[in-house]
């Protein structure tokens, strides 16, 4: 939660497959909206688990991600650049407004990139996943690998006739 309001996009993975897929999509999303992006994966449950994943062929990945052509590269020989404070007080609010707008614009970009990724791999995720919500009386909001545990709990409760 320490970076919740930092202005970075965050993609959370339930499984190792989803983490891998998020990494591939993250490049395109971040570059399209000019915001940093984090692919978040549980620090023990998925990171220490052995799980098969379906890899995308290298050539398909290169084609999907594209060539990286930064407008302002920090490490460019012959053209040094320094990075200081986020913004001076005079420009801070305008910079934060632009950051907030980029965050809103990211929703459409995530949908578009996700659709293209789904066409390439058959795997789609969307912005938010719902599970058995059509007639639910209660809901859980959860991120990461705990979502799998929550789905199992929902299955058990449904088997007992609870909504």
Q: PLM ranges: what are they?
A:
Residues 1-43, 67-68:
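Conserved thiamine diphosphate
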Residues 37-129:
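Conformationally flexible catalytic loops at phosphate/diphosphate-handling active centers
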Residues 116-139, 151, 155:
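Glycine-/acidic-rich phosphate or pyrophosphate-binding loops and their flanking alpha/beta elements
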Residues 153-163:
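Short helix-loop-beta junction
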Residues 35-37, 79, 136-141, 162:
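Structural beta-strand/beta-sheet cores of well-ordered domains, especially the beta-sheet scaffolds
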Residues 9-14, 137-143:
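Short glycine-rich or small-residue beta-strand-to-loop segments that form or flank ligand, phosphate
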Residues 21-24, 49-52, 151-154:
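A short secondary-structure junction signal
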Residues 16-17, 44-46, 143-149:
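Gly/Ser/Thr-rich loops at beta-strand to alpha-helix junctions
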């Amino acid at each position: 939660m320490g970076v919740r309001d930092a202005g970075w996009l965050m993609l959370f993975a339930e499984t190792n497959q989803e983490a891998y897929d998020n990494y591939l999509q993250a490049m395109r999303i971040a570059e399209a909206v000019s915001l940093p992006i984090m692919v978040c994966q549980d620090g023990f449950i998925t990171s220490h688990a052995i799980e098969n994943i379906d890899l995308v062929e290298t050539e398909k990945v290169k084609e999907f991600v594209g060539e990286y052509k930064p407008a302002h590269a920090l490490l460019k020989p012959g053209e040094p650049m320094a990075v200081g404070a986020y913004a001076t007080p005079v420009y801070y609010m305008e910079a934060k407004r632009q950051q907030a707008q980029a965050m809103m614009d990211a929703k459409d970009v995530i949908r578009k990139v996700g659709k293209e990724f789904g066409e390439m791999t058959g795997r789609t995720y969307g912005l938010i996943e719902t599970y058995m919500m059509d007639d639910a009386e209660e809901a859980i909001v959860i991120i990461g690998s705990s979502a799998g545990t929550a789905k199992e709990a929902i299955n058990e409760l449904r088997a007992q006739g609870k909504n």
